[in-house]
């Protein structure tokens, strides 16, 4: 009797699957479904709301650990907004930046839980967020400056002969913000999880091959543990980088530089 061995791809963990689906005859052929990415996004929102309620600490004067952690996040995001935009105009964008930071951070952390789903590894999610941010910054620029907003694509002090080429380069660079902002987040999360999956499978195969290989497998196992700590740091760093770049794009819309 032959045994078939199936080799699972490291990309299988990122596959979007239907968990529940319903076909209804309302409004034509209506298909309703709950996917794993939808489920984990719902879980992340629930965790954020729970965290916010715990951090209020029933409005007590003495803060608890949840309150201290939330105040640290507040201070971090507020410092980014003030430094990247400015102390006055930046205040109105602080709630948006805080929501972006905590949403990306929580979804990054959920993805680190074994057998969970990394929502921020999907480009459809990160591109949707980045496109919304860049589009909002562009609308803000036109609202404040009108057609003068196009001066953002004209480098100061450039020769007249090179002006058409430089304007084209600046315009393409501006459009690429939609892609680069979302691509940076998804690519970092995707590559980290793929590497952990490959190393985990490699270590498992070594450690189940005998006592000697089990001892040798402790070396890559230690590396996996260390790399998991690095992934935890990357979860925070990528949320911070996303907010920093979002603030810089908003600043361009406000100040045209």
Swiss-Prot record:
The chain crosses the membrane at residues 34-54, 93-113, 122-142, 149-169, 187-207, 210-230, 231-251. It comes from the Eukaryota. The keyword Amino-acid biosynthesis does not apply. GO terms for cellular component: mitochondrial inner membrane; proton-transporting ATP synthase complex. The keyword Transport applies. It is a multi-pass membrane protein. CDD domains: ATP-synt_Fo_a_6. Residues 1-8 form a propeptide. GO terms for molecular function: proton-transporting ATP synthase activity, rotational mechanism. SUPFAM superfamilies: F1F0 ATP synthase subunit A. Its main location: mitochondrion. Keywords: ATP synthesis, CF(0), Hydrogen ion transport, Ion transport, Membrane, Mitochondrion, Mitochondrion inner membrane, Transmembrane, Transmembrane helix, Transport. InterPro entries: ATP_synth_F0_asu, ATP_synth_F0_asu_AS, ATP_synth_F0_asu_bact/mt, F0_ATP_A_sf. Coiled coil: none annotated. It is found in: Mitochondrion inner membrane. Belongs to the ATPase A chain family. NCBIfam families: ATP_synt_6_or_A, PRK05815.2-4. Mitochondrial membrane ATP synthase (F(1)F(0) ATP synthase or Complex V) produces ATP from ADP in the presence of a proton gradient across the membrane which is generated by electron transport complexes of the respiratory chain. F-type ATPases consist of two structural domains, F(1) - containing the extramembraneous catalytic core and F(0) - containing the membrane proton channel, linked together by a central stalk and a peripheral stalk. During catalysis, ATP synthesis in the catalytic domain of F(1) is coupled via a rotary mechanism of the central stalk subunits to proton translocation. F-type ATPases have 2 components, CF(1) - the catalytic core - and CF(0) - the membrane proton channel. CF(1) has five subunits: alpha(3), beta(3), gamma(1), delta(1), epsilon(1). CF(0) has three main subunits: a, b and c. This is ATP synthase subunit a. The lineage of its organism: Eukaryota, Fungi, Dikarya, Ascomycota, Pezizomycotina. The gene is atp6.
């Amino acid at each position: 009797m032959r045994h078939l061995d199936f080799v699972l791809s490291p990309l299988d963990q990122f596959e979007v699957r239907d968990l529940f689906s319903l076909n209804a005859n309302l409004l034509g052929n209506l298909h309703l479904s709950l996917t794993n990415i939808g489920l984990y996004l719902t879980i992340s929102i629930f965790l954020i709301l729970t965290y916010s309620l715990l951090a209020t600490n029933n409005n007590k004067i003495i803060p608890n650990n949840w309150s201290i952690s939330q105040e640290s996040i507040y201070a971090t995001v507020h410092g980014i907004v003030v430094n990247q935009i400015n102390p006055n105009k930046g205040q109105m964008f602080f709630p948006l930046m805080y929501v972006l930071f905590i949403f990306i951070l929580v979804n990054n952390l959920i993805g680190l839980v074994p057998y969970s789903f990394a929502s921020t590894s999907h480009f459809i999610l990160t591109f949707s967020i980045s496109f919304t941010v860049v589009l909002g910054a562009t609308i803000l620029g036109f609202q404040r400056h009108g057609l003068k907003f196009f001066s953002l694509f004209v480098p100061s002090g450039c020769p007249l002969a090179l002006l058409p080429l430089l304007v084209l380069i600046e315009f393409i660079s501006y459009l690429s913000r939609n892609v680069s902002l979302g691509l940076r987040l998804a690519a970092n999360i995707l590559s980290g999880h793929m590497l952990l999956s490959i190393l985990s499978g490699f270590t498992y195969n070594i450690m189940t091959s005998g006592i000697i290989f089990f001892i040798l497998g402790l070396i890559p196992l230690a590396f996996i543990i260390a790399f998991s700590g690095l992934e935890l740091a990357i979860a925070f760093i990528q949320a911070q980088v996303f907010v920093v770049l979002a603030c810089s794009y908003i600043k361009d819309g406000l100040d045209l530089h």
